[in-house]
UniProtKB/Swiss-Prot annotation:
Species name: Xenopus tropicalis
A family per Pfam: MOZART2
InterPro entries in the record: MOZART2
Protein name, as recorded: Mitotic-spindle organizing protein 2B
Assembly: Part of the gamma-tubulin complex. Interacts with TUBG1.
Intracellular or extracellular location(s): Cytoplasm, Cytoskeleton, Microtubule organizing center, Centrosome; Cytoplasm, Cytoskeleton, Spindle
Residues making up the signal peptide according to the UniProt record: none
Keyword flag Cytoplasm: yes
Amino acid sequence: MSRGQTEGSQAMASSQAAGPGPSPDAIVSVSGTVQKYVAKKKKVLNPEEAELYELTQAAGIVIDQEVFKILVDLLKMNVAPLAVFQMLKSMCAGHRIADTVSADSSSISLAPGHSDVRGRNKPNPTTSTTQGPGERSSREGSSQRIPRQPSGSRMQKSSSSGKSSGGSST
């Protein structure tokens, strides 16, 4: 037998003699690793971000600190909130599909997701003053696109029927 095999067999014999549970040395090293991980995780957020993170938890939002840090960094870089939301939605799409397949209720679980998106885009008198400029500009852009389509249809209608109300000249 080689020296490595002898040490391995001695370690196995000592662990069997100690009992079926893990040795105290293993527990100490695992708890030390966990403590290092927790300390590292706590250092992820600066004090201001940590306060925001605590507020999100108080609001009932469960999110990993590292994911929260990424979101905060994106928003600090002036990435549009809608773009961040769409990115998160696309990243989570795989998880939702797996969840719905396991639950066998794909139509029920997908329906609230679509209604949430539509509900957020509706103008709300209480939140209309707090909306960011990105959301307003997207609404303005869509309102600019809407008149182009009816103008083409008006011209087709007026040329086909030969009747014109004359109101479109102003």
